[in-house]
Amino acid sequence: MSVSAPLLDAKVRYGRDGWLPLPHTLSDPDVRKLRQRIEGISREQRPEVVLEEGSSAVRALHGCHDFDEVCARLVRLPALVGLAEQLLGGPVYVYQFKVNMKQAHEGAAWPWHQDFAFWHHEDGMGAPDAVNIAIFLDDVTDENGPLEVIPGSQHAGIVEDTARPGRERSHDWRHHVSAKLEYVVPDEIAGRLAGTFGVRRLTGPAGTAVAFHPSIIHSSSNNTSAQRRCVLLITYNRVTNTPAHPVRPPFLVSRDSTPVVPVDADRL
């Protein structure tokens, strides 16, 4: 099958920069449908719902595609699956599904980190042959804690946390989803890389979609605004890159590496 020139350009840009704005955006009705489901799940008491430390504010939701029909259809939209397969060069499955919610005035920051550090050290993923696709469910602005990436930083490989040498690691999964992350990139290293490559804030209206590399260094600030910032993230992993013995809960790391079969149309 031939690859179109625009897709080749996209693959080159993704390989160079580690992130890519997607031409596919969710329609307003689909965004509203997802918001409704996410808000409903947020009110449930279940392990997939993570709260901010010392607060009743919801920080994140995990694995919603395993128990919610709307989220299950979302991960099978042809535009998303097709892009993931083209970027990764083969069949993919859903490795992670999460919704990061920064509540107005309460949403805490995510420090500089790389997703692949968690997946490699905790789950045994062999290579960063995966892709994150972020979908904005709210308008994301400079004020409500947007995702910030260091373009090209994925080429540095895994940047170990040298700021705390000898620190005993915790394998409690809660330390992988809180504001006090287990694997972080020290500010001085992130600052040095940012000085070389720059920093890009990923903002846009609700429905915007962005792809980014598992090894790209990224962070986000506190939400000090009066507007919530909700971003849904789907991680597609190449089937041949499936970790052999993941130990974290299934709602964090899928055990089902069956290739995703797209639905018939790009709508929910």
UniProtKB/Swiss-Prot annotation:
GO terms for biological process: antibiotic biosynthetic process; antibiotic metabolic process. Fe cation binds at H113, D115, H218. It is an enzyme of class 1 (oxidoreductase). InterPro entries: Phytyl_CoA_dOase-like (IPR008775). Optimum pH is 7.5. Pathway: Antibiotic biosynthesis. SUPFAM superfamilies: Clavaminate synthase-like. Its cofactor is Fe(2+). Keywords: Antibiotic biosynthesis, Iron, Metal-binding, Oxidoreductase. Optimum temperature is 25 degrees Celsius. Pfam families: PhyH. It catalyses: L-proline + 2-oxoglutarate + O2 = trans-4-hydroxy-L-proline + succinate + CO2. Its EC number is 1.14.11.57. Gene3D superfamilies: q2cbj1_9rhob like domain. One of its GO terms (molecular function) is 2-oxoglutarate-dependent dioxygenase activity. Competitively inhibited by pyridine-2,4-dicarboxylate. Inhibited by diethyl pyrocarbonate (DEPC), 3,4-dihydroxybenzoate, pyridine-2,5-dicarboxylate, alpha,alpha'-dipyridyl, and some metal ions such as Co(2+) and Zn(2+). The keyword Ubl conjugation does not apply. Binds 1 Fe(2+) ion. Belongs to the PhyH family. Involved in the biosynthesis of the peptidolactone antibiotic etamycin (viridogrisein). Monomer. This is L-proline trans-4-hydroxylase. It comes from Streptomyces griseoviridis.
